[in-house]
Regions:
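Short, Lys/Arg-enriched N-terminal segments with co-localized hydrophobic residues
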Residues: 6-21
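Hydrophobic residues in well-ordered beta-strands that form the structural core
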Residues: 50, 98-100, 177, 218
């Protein structure tokens, strides 16, 4: 936890406005270490969870207790099993409202399909979505405006959640991108509804158009920045 808290402190100092009061807890969990992001605001007493890998409730419950925050929403970047495996338990335990993109409705509500794709039964349960989101949607969470950008290619319903920065305050924004983009890589496109050509259009049109200093929080692996990936990502050069 010491390393994580140090990282969070660095991130918080760079965030603008309402984001300055927010802590980002990076929690790799589940069978393939999928990143969940717990956003907590102790002043408001509220928290938001981005993605829900397996057994994530056991990870976030003590943090919610320590920060005196109630989990109010769960946002799914997409409907693949490793990002929603713990979603049903999270909703049962917290009554959090769920947001996701309708293009992944069949994956989220009919997890048997993912069982067929991956070839094993991981005890997946359907997750009830309260609000279907789409490209360009904006809403408020923890006192901050959030923008939805649709980034299909890894799968049809992959979205990112963007918190804008503030140039005047030299504060970077943050984008939680699911499996569209990783540090030095991109999401796989060989699963049903995947398309590398579509993924490339999504990344160039929806992620690379964000400010270069935007912090990118991916579904797997370490964080990066938009500028770093534009300069060095070997899958999207030229």
């Amino acid at each position: 936890m010491t390393r994580l808290r140090c990282f969070l402190g660095v991130a918080r100092r760079r965030f603008p406005g309402g984001l300055a009061a927010m802590k980002i807890h990076v929690l790799p969990a589940g069978p393939i270490q999928t990143n969940a992001y717990l956003l907590t605001d102790s002043a408001r007493g509220e928290a938001v969870l981005i993605d829900a890998p397996g057994d994530i409730w056991a990870e976030i419950e003590p943090i919610l207790t320590e920060t005196k925050c109630k989990l109010v929403e769960l946002w799914l970047t997409h409907g693949h099993w490793d990002h929603m495996q713990g979603g049903a338990e999270v909703v049962r335990e917290s009554s959090a409202k769920v947001r996701a993109h309708k293009d992944d409705q069949i994956l989220i509500e009919t997890p048997e399909i993912m069982i067929e794709i991956i070839g094993r039964d991981l005890g997946l349960e359907p997750v009830k979505v309260d609000t279907w989101i789409a490209q360009g949607d904006k809403f408020e969470a923890l006192g901050v405006e959030v923008e939805v950008r649709h980034v299909p290619g890894h799968c049809m319903g992959n979205v990112l959640f963007y918190f804008a920065g503030n140039k005047d305050k030299k504060a970077a924004g943050a984008a939680f991108v699911g499996d569209a983009l990783f540090a030095g890589s991109v999401g796989r496109t060989d699963l049903p509804s995947g398309s590398f050509e579509q993924l490339e259009r999504s990344v160039r049109g929806q992620i690379y158009t964000l400010p270069d200093d935007t912090l990118v929080f991916p579904g797997h692996g370490p964080r990066t920045t938009v500028g770093t990936e534009k300069r060095t990502n070997p899958y999207l050069q030229g």
